[in-house]
């Protein structure tokens, strides 16, 4: 829909990924999953932002097609004794002029695994939440909001190709991984056969997408260390 211009030029992007599983100091109590994620020797320079915030970043770039220009970040650690961040707020400037904000937290009580994205353009807006993945809220400017359901009227051809179950039959997380594996296999098969890959396979993340995520994390960490100073996040 964005690629087709239904939102017009993108102006504002809100991305968030919030959880509450690190609200208590379980990393200091032998919880293996929490322990390594908050250990700078094993996890690197960031915990929360590198663990889940980067997924919100990747989602925002994938959906909008935008590229980052610079970030202003505030990484915080709320649980005493924890060595890496458990909360992150990042202001984003995109190449082309759009603005964005990304929030990531693992101490947001009441949130199990809440990934969400809101995109607003000159002609309309889109809103999606990972805990309700079957629906997409689309609002053309000056018109009533429309709730689009996976497998229902209004789905784009690519969305239909990415679905496996009929509309109304819950689908999502596991099937998303299956689509990634299928896309990767198709890219390999097409390369070996010397033919163009299927169009859905072209959406499969590659090493450059991973490198973009690393560049984003590094820029945000540097910005936070400089009290939120605007820091280049360009991936050239």
What are these regions (language model features)?
Residues 1-4, 187-191, 210, 223-224:
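Hydrophobic side-chain positions on well-ordered alpha-helices
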Residues 1-82, 136, 227:
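Predominantly a Rossmann-like dinucleotide-binding segment in NAD(P)-dependent oxidoreductases
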Residues 33, 37, 62, 70, ...:
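C-terminal glycine/acidic-rich active-site capping loop/insertion
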Residues 50-53, 174, 204-211:
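Conserved loop-to-helix N-cap of the C-terminal "lid" that shapes the substrate pocket in Rossmann-like
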Residues 52-71, 76-125, 130-134:
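Glycine-rich, aromatic-lined ligand/substrate-binding cores of catalytic
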Residues 56-57, 180-185, 217:
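A general structural signal for well-ordered alpha-helical segments in protein cores
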Residues 127, 195-199, 205-208, 212-213, ...:
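NAD(P)-dependent dehydrogenase/reductase Rossmann-like domain
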Residues 213-220:
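Alpha-helical scaffold segments in carbohydrate-active enzymes
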């Amino acid at each position: 829909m964005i690629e087709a211009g239904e939102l017009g030029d993108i102006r504002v992007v809100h991305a968030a990924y919030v959880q509450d599983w690190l609200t208590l100091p379980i990393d200091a109590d032998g919880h293996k999953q929490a322990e390594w994620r908050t250990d700078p020797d094993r996890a690197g320079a960031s915990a929360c932002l590198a663990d889940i915030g980067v997924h919100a970043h990747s989602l925002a770039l994938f959906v909008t097609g935008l590229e980052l220009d610079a970030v202003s970040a505030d990484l915080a650690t709320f649980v005493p004794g924890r060595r890496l961040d458990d909360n992150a707020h990042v202001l984003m400037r995109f190449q082309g002029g759009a603005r964005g904000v990304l929030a990531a937290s693992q101490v947001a009580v009441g949130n199990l695994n809440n990934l969400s994205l809101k995109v607003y353009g000159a002609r309309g807006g889109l809103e999606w939440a990972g805990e309700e993945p079957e629906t997409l809220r689309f609002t053309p400017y000056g018109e009533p909001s429309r709730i689009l359901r996976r497998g229902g009227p209004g789905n784009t051809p690519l969305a239909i190709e990415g679905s496996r179950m009929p509309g109304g039959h819950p689908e999502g997380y596991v099937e998303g991984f299956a689509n990634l594996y299928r896309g990767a296999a198709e890219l390999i098969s097409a390369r070996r056969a010397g033919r163009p890959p299927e169009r859905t396979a072209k959406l499969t993340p590659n090493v450059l997408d991973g490198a973009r995520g690393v560049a984003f994390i590094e820029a945000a960490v540097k910005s936070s260390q400089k009290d939120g100073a605007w820091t280049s996040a360009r991936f050239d």
